[in-house]
A protein has these predicted regions:
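Conserved class I S-adenosyl-L-methionine
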Residues: 81-91, 99
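Conserved S-adenosyl-L-methionine
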Residues: 98-106
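S-adenosyl-L-methionine
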Residues: 106-161
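N-terminal Rossmann-like NAD(P) cofactor-binding module of classical short-chain dehydrogenase/reductase
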Residues: 86, 151, 177
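A short glycine-rich, Lys/Arg-flanked "PGG" loop and its adjoining helix->strand segment in the class I
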Residues: 160-180
């Protein structure tokens, strides 16, 4: 470790958290202690002399979005076992990870950004990463089939602008969970 570094980076580098995103989540949840004191600031500067602990249970997904989708699946009784799913607005892949842990057979992770999807998901043969793709340009032909389930957590664009494209990616009768952002 360098003489001083950000807490979230150090937790990931030392393997106390599997990724920087999970480190940030654990910090935000009050699960990280520096020298016996809870620390809720991911950018806090730590040194090699500091004692770092992660207590309790951090989120079980690569991103916090997975918690949102997991709760929706639970409340609405949606079973993803064996389904082909789309994660629209994948980012780090919280929804993708949740879908896989819920039994999805395959997930197409679509995001207009680049190099955001967690490396564990990029390496997973059940995941097709379609980064750099505007969701409005995605088609069933691009996927090779219509999906059985769609999860959407798009940012920086109104859900209303992408909903027609999203609906075109799934077959009739398929379920979808789409988050609505208050800024739109």
């Amino acid at each position: 470790m360098t003489p001083t570094a950000r807490l979230d980076l150090v937790l990931a580098k030392l393997g106390k958290c599997p990724s920087r995103e999970k480190a940030k989540a654990a910090i935000a949840q009050g699960l990280v202690y520096v020298n016996g004191q809870v620390c809720t600031k991911a950018s806090a500067v730590v040194t090699p002399a500091d004692k770092l602990e992660v207590r309790g249970c951090a989120i079980p997904f690569v991103g916090r979005g997975g918690l949102k989708l997991a709760r929706a699946l639970e409340v609405w009784g949606i079973d993803l076992s064996g389904l082909r799913c789309v994660d629209a607005g994948a980012s780090t892949g919280g929804f993708t990870d949740c879908m896989l842990q819920a039994g999805a057979a395959h997930v197409w992770s679509i995001d207009v950004g680049h190099d955001q999807l967690h490396e564990s998901l990029v390496a997973d043969e059940r995941v097709t990463s379609l980064e750099g793709l505007d969701i409005r340009l995605a088609t069933p032909e691009l996927l090779g089939t219509e999906a059985d389930f769609l999860g959407s957590d798009v940012s920086f664009i109104s859900l209303g602008k992408v909903l027609p494209s999203l609906a075109g990616l799934i077959h009739a009768g398929a379920h979808a969970v789409c988050l609505v952002k208050p800024q739109f």
